[in-house]
Amino acid sequence: HSNGGEIEMADTITVFKGDGIGPEITDSVLRILDAAGADLNYEVFNVGAAEYEAHGELIPKEGYASMEKTHILLKSPITTPLGKGFRSLNVTLRKKYDLYANIRPAKTNSAVKTAFENVDIVIFRENTEDLYAGVEEMIDKDTVHSIKIITRRCCERIIRAAFDYAVSHNRKKVTCVHKANIMKMADGMFRDIFYDISKEYPDIEADDKIVDNVAMQLVMHPEKFDIIVTENLYGDVLSDLVSGLIGGLGLLPSSNLGKDFAMFEAVHGSAPDIAGQGIANPTAFLWSACMLLEHIGKNDVAAKIRKAVDLVLEDGSVLTPDIGGTATTIEYEKAIIAHL
């Protein structure tokens, strides 16, 4: 599967139910997808801490077999089991499928009161290298050497992914965010490759900004940004900053793309404190599912769902407790389906 170029029509997707509120929001989202006419088959697996307690593995073997076949994962929140020797499932999947692009859209909506009204930013964060490659050593007992790795291959693919997304989603501008004034070689290369690739996309405006300036601009004039493409560390920080602009992580979807694998999930965690109470908000996970639909070319279905959610949020009479209402997950889900 690729975001933009040759799109395979996938009608079977792998779904991980996860921990905490994961199973509840998964059930709701799959029912909404069906009601919207998404026309998908689901291979659903219980995954996470509970699965590990029961069977000694985070992901059942059948789950891996399913992903090898479908190349698409819709993943609800998962708790990493406590104890030594556990990488988070995301790190495991990122390494296994070389998920090089972390994509975080942040868009204001009427349900959450924030200081800004028309934020609509998508951050493309390189997911595999930079300082996060984890190459560190103690030179002596008082000195650590930490290495920043930037490669042409990884720069090219994240930058191309951002421009392809701009084309397929009718966006106008891509901004390269860097610190090339200080890291002239590493970030200089990232910026230079950005402008080289931008020439292949004459209809998309391309500019670059220094990361500290971007942090300031984002909290003053976030509406001036469209798509941001950046390295791993800057992307990690800026994507959470942008989340704060629109009221926090609770309503944010994300996707992780590899060359032939894509994973879609909500940014929020498994919220064990409200699990099983039937009041979880499925919106972020639903929007993650909309990103999945767009990825496989079902843009019309995604648009229909987004519109229905917007109408329910605007109406404001059927909202879950986290966004100021008293509705249950099921009531909220039914309101969305009624607006389809």
Model-derived segments and their meaning:
Residues 1-8:
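Short, Lys/Arg-enriched N-terminal segments with co-localized hydrophobic residues
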Residues 14-35, 140-212, 224:
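Glycine-rich phosphate/diphosphate-binding loop of Rossmann-like nucleotide-binding domains
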Residues 19-22, 71, 124, 162, ...:
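Buried hydrophobic positions in well-ordered alpha/beta secondary-structure cores of metabolic enzymes
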Residues 29, 33, 194, 285-293, ...:
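Buried hydrophobic packing segments
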Residues 40-61, 218:
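N-terminal beta-loop-helix "entrance" segment that forms/cooperates
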Residues 41, 169-178, 201-209, 298-306, ...:
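Flexible, glycine/charged-enriched surface loops at secondary-structure junctions
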Residues 49-51, 217-317:
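Glycine-rich phosphate/nucleotide-binding loop
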Residues 52-148, 233:
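N-terminal glycine-rich phosphate/adenylate-binding segment common to multiple enzyme folds
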